[in-house]
Amino acid sequence: MVDFGALPPEINSARMYAGPGSASLVAAAQMWDSVASDLFSAASAFQSVVWGLTVGSWIGSSAGLMVAAASPYVAWMSVTAGQAELTAAQVRVAAAAYETAYGLTVPPPVIAENRAELMILIATNLLGQNTPAIAVNEAEYGEMWAQDAAAMFGYAAATATATATLLPFEEAPEMTSAGGLLEQAAAVEEASDTAAANQLMNNVPQALQQLAQPTQGTTPSSKLGGLWKTVSPHRSPISNMVSMANNHMSMTNSGVSMTNTLSSMLKGFAPAAAAQAVQTAAQNGVRAMSSLGSSLGSSGLGGGVAANLGRAASVGSLSVPQAWAAANQAVTPAARALPLTSLTSAAERGPGQMLGGLPVGQMGARAGGGLSGVLRVPPRPYVMPHSPAAG
């Protein structure tokens, strides 16, 4: 606190009279009263709404959550309104203290007149005749000093007491929680994903059907563009179907490769019949690949892929597709009689192993329908060369 007693009355009086006065304090008190009144009205309105939630038509868990969220805010408005009202009252106390100090402060003109009188008395005090008057003047100035100091000390004490009872204002409580905001965002995202999935389920079949059967006047690029926009966000199921089709085609290619390998192996045993059987099997495999590609193209990747376990034909320890046995029937329906062996004509039966149409006896005797095209060279007669010595 400032030591107002050490300051002359000229400074204290000048400070008190140079200020704006108590008008600003009175205006501030009125504004605080208005704020307090508005807060009380808002708190009352909020409280009535909260009470209506518990007894009105909106009753349930949502109403309970609303009451729990709004009640702290209503309490805060009531407390803040009381603090605003107290602030207005204390501002009025400070304004009253100012008015009191202002009334007790010696007006600056009076102090200036006293000082001017003192200077005159000193200037005319040639023989000491003004000494009593100078003493009286100094006593009056001392009283002015003490009066201004007392007024300032009283004003400082009153304002300190008024401001000491004021409490700091608190911020409004949060009516929403971070967890609730996160749950809301998760719910919105889940709803968006569900809507997108439903839209995909509804749009993909129609788009595929339109792509398979394009109408006149519509360019393929527009169809493909619309299909891509529809399918692009959710390409995983279609990618899986394409992958399954590729796997099936890869298996077919592997079968063709195995057929070519078997062809090379059998060329040394039965060149003509084996080559014909393997060529027929390879053609069947190619036709199977073509039918697979056409079925996938016509159904818009909608056709299923079928597979059987334990249904393959066998060549020794090698498992081969069933189509190879069917292709082998075209080589020779039944083995012919073997004139140079003890084997008789074999009756035509169902498809057996891959070498069922290539009798071993025929290969040994160089006879049979499957090997009828083998070149036979008759023995050539030996001609004795003519000797020059014989003449």
Swiss-Prot record:
Cellular localization per UniProt: Secreted, Cell wall; Cell surface
Signal peptide positions on this chain: none
Pfam families (UniProt xref): PPE, PPE-SVP
Primary residence: secreted
Cited InterPro entries: PPE_C, PPE_dom, PPE_sf
GO biological process, one term: response to host immune response
Keyword Secreted: yes
Highest taxon of the lineage: Bacteria
Keywords, ordered alphabetically: Cell wall, Secreted, Virulence
Any one GO CC term of the record: cell surface
Phenotype on disruption: Mice infected with the ppe18 deleted strain have reduced infection burden in lung, liver and spleen and have better survival rates compared to mice infected with the wild-type train.
Upregulating conditions: Expression is positively regulated by Rv0485.
Note on domains (UniProt): The N-terminal region is responsible for interaction with TLR2. It is also important in mediating tyrosine phosphorylation of SOCS-3.
Annotated function: Could be a crucial virulence factor for intracellular survival of M.tuberculosis. Favors development of Th2-type response, and down-regulates the pro-inflammatory and Th1-type response. Specifically interacts with the human Toll-like receptor 2 (TLR2), leading to an early and sustained activation of p38 MAPK, which induces IL-10 production and activates Th2-type immune response. Also inhibits pro-inflammatory cytokines IL-12p40 and TNF-alpha production.
Family: Belongs to the mycobacterial PPE family.
Subunit and partners: Interacts with human TLR2.
UniProt cross-references to PANTHER family, sorted A to Z: GLUTAMINE-RICH PROTEIN 2 (PTHR46766:SF1)
Protein name: PPE family protein PPE18
